[in-house]
């Protein structure tokens, strides 16, 4: 069930972030991503509380990404990791270029 839950959300080749809103790392990751203007439907925030039991979901994250913690961030079906990974990409000033290259940002 966890596999289906996750894979359905990754199917549209968008930016997907799995979060728990009480997690400060999740809020920080959302702050980074919210600096960008995404195309409609190209960015999805998934609260892991939507899935029960949560441990099954975390086990599946570990299976496919190597980590159980949130946030779990995907560009398309590719996991980029968690908050520290996103922060590193952002600090290298590469995040905007990556998001643009995968076609999820609005163009003016």
From Swiss-Prot:
InterPro entries: GLR_AS, GLRX1, Glutaredoxin, Glutaredoxin_euk/vir, Glutaredoxin_subgr, Thioredoxin-like_sf. The keyword Cytoplasm does not apply. Induction: Expressed in the intermediate phase of the viral replicative cycle. Disulfide bonds join 23-26. The keyword Disulfide bond applies. Its main location: virion. GO terms for cellular component: virion component. It comes from the Viruses. Displays thioltransferase and dehydroascorbate reductase activities. This is Glutaredoxin-1. The gene is OPG075.
